């Protein structure tokens, strides 16, 4: 599955992280 930066950020924020980005086509969240 493709990783979209905007979707990733939204998902991460919804889980309580400050943001997220795509690395190797996976969404990675960070504090």
UniProtKB/Swiss-Prot annotation:
Main location (coarse class): secreted
UniProt subcellular location: Secreted
Known tissue expression: Expressed by the venom gland.
Tell me if Hydrolase is a UniProt keyword of this record.
no
Q: Which GO terms describe its cellular component?
A: extracellular region
Domain comment, as recorded = Has the structural arrangement of an alpha-helix connected to antiparallel beta-sheets by disulfide bonds (CS-alpha/beta).
User: What name does the UniProt record give this protein?
Assistant: Potassium channel toxin alpha-KTx 19.2
């Amino acid at each position: 599955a493709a990783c979209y930066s905007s979707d990733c950020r939204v998902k991460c924020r919804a889980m309580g992280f400050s943001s997220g980005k795509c690395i190797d086509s996976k969404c990675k969240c960070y504090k």
